[in-house]
Structure formats: structure tokens, C-alpha cells
């Protein structure tokens, strides 16, 4: 019985570790995707591809809604400061601000007004920078 408990404990630890690694890799991939979307939007503004801009805003908003779930305790990694888990409420509020700014970008794209779109992109980028200043190490 003692060996069964020990084996079960070791397996649970390994599974948790593998799960954390998966969460870390997935969140890194989503952040890279956001960067790619924002870069693409710069090109799409010049082309007048408003549907693509709106879709990009929606995609970023969808990630922002899920983002806090990808930072469970124990998923510390290079680049993520401990401040995320120390002040998780602030981290969550910054994710909400990111979501709201992304939805504003989506709405601005529907107006087809480049000025509104650029203002929305700047606001969205500001929410990214705000979070990075507080919670990203590099």
C-alpha cells in the first residue's frame, strides 16, 4: 500500500509538471500570435482590409478573456514575473482592459475610419505595454 501511494504521488507530480509545461508553451504561442496580429493590422489599415482588422481585434479579445486561466499557480517561467501570482487581481484587471481595448478595435474597424482604427490600435497596444511593465521580466 505504501508503494502504491508513493507511485501515485510521483505520477501525479509528473503529470502536474507536464501540464504546467503545456500551459506555458500554449500561452507563449498565444502571445506570439497576438504580436503577429498587431503587425498584420498595421498593413491591413493601409489596404483598407477592415474585416481582417475586426477579426484580429476579436481574436485578441478572445485570448484576453482566457489569458488568466493560462497563468495557474506553479506555471512560473522565464519572462513571467512573480508579481503575476502575488497580485493576480491586478493581472486579471489588465487582461480585462486588454479585452475591452481589443473589442473597441473590432468596433472601430467596422466604421472603416482609419483614424478611429489607429486610435484603437494605440489604446490596445497601451494595454499590452501596461501589463508588460508590471508582469514581464524582459
Residue ranges and their predicted role:
Residues 15, 122-125:
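Processing junctions and N-termini across compartments
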Residues 7-14:
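Bacterial N-terminal signal peptides
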Residues 15-21:
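Sec/Tat signal peptide C-region and signal peptidase I cleavage site
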Residues 21-123:
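Extracytoplasmic c-type cytochrome modules immediately beyond a signal peptide or single-pass transmembrane anchor
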Amino acid at each position: 500500500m505504501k508503494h502504491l501511494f508513493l507511485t501515485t504521488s510521483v505520477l501525479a507530480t509528473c503529470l502536474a509538471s507536464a501540464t504546467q509545461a503545456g500551459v506555458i508553451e500554449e500561452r507563449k504561442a498565444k502571445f506570439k500570435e497576438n504580436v503577429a496580429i498587431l503587425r498584420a493590422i498595421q498593413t491591413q489599415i493601409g489596404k483598407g482590409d477592415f474585416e481582417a482588422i475586426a477579426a484580429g481585434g476579436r481574436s485578441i479579445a478572445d485570448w484576453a478573456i482566457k489569458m488568466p486561466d493560462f497563468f495557474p499557480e506553479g506555471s512560473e517561467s522565464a519572462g513571467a514575473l512573480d508579481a503575476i501570482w502575488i497580485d493576480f487581481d491586478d493581472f486579471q484587471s489588465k487582461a480585462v482592459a486588454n479585452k475591452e481595448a481589443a473589442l473597441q478595435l473590432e468596433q472601430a474597424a467596422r466604421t472603416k475610419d482609419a483614424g478611429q482604427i489607429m486610435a484603437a490600435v494605440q489604446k490596445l497596444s497601451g494595454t499590452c505595454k501596461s501589463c508588460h511593465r508590471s508582469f514581464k521580466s524582459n
